């Protein structure tokens, strides 16, 4: 990771480019933190949320955030919502427990892939995909299989730059109840960092890694960041607060 002085310069250089961004999944745990950090760092000239419902915010910092409400079952009809964005962040996701196996596949694979296709067609140059540690299209575990399938399909779209993030267990206080994740967070949260680094990461660290990677020069058409790389890239890099 670049030192703080270099990182600050990279951020300032990025701001001068007056780029626009869209966020998918801004109502989720990672998406909420991502939006807050993007606004706090003032990285983009235009910020757009794309989702199935309009979100409400109380803070003034959110006043200029644009929102596009779409029907994910009919995304082709909402292609204009994906046009004119330089950068895209996809934090969409649900669980098999909440949506059932078919619903999970529909959201985590079909919605994500169609959104990526529309973003590519709409001119998006840099697509950032939140995936998962262990993602593998050949996995016998549905969750990891779907994540791996999406990664492969999005890579085929040939964005100018594709950044895929594979965090482990996300350490946060979810509003949505996920008992398995809760137990894992309690377990990994009690371990020394050196032990947990391969398996868990705070959400805010994931988000800061995403943004630090964003403003840094790309390392190729596709960048794959595993949990340890995310921890390294996102640590000790506090941005401005709202």
Curated annotation (Swiss-Prot):
Superkingdom, natural source: Eukaryota
Any one Gene Ontology cellular component term annotated for this protein: nuclear envelope
SUPFAM superfamilies: NAD(P)-binding Rossmann-fold domains
Coiled-coil region(s): none
Residues annotated as catalytic: 143 (proton acceptor), 147
Keywords, sorted A to Z: Acetylation, Disulfide bond, NADP, Translation regulation
Gene Ontology MF: a single term: protein serine/threonine kinase activity
Pfam family of the protein (one): NAD_binding_10
Chain spans, region Required for interaction with elongation factor EEF1A1: 2-25
GO biological process: angiogenesis; import into nucleus; positive regulation of programmed cell death; positive regulation of transcription by RNA polymerase II; regulation of angiogenesis
Protein role: Represses translation by preventing reactivation of elongation factor eEF1A. May also inhibit nuclear import by competing with nuclear import substrates for binding to a subset of nuclear transport receptors. Has additionally been proposed to act as a redox sensor involved in cellular oxidative stress surveillance. May bind NADPH.
Subunit description: Monomer. Forms homodimers during oxidative stress. Interacts (via N-terminus) with elongation factor EEF1A1 (via middle-region); the interaction is direct and competes with EEF1A1 binding to guanyl-nucleotide exchange factor EEF1B2, thereby inhibiting GDP for GTP exchange and reactivation of EEF1A1. Interacts with nuclear transport receptors XPO4, IPO5/RANBP5, IPO7, IPO9 and KPNB1 as well as GCN1L1/GCN1 and LRPPRC probably through their HEAT repeats. Binds NCOA5/CIA.
PANTHER family attached to this UniProt entry: OXIDOREDUCTASE HTATIP2
Protein name in UniProt: Protein HTATIP2
Organism field: Rattus norvegicus (Rat)
Organism ancestry: Eukaryota, Metazoa, Chordata, Craniata, Vertebrata
Gene: Htatip2
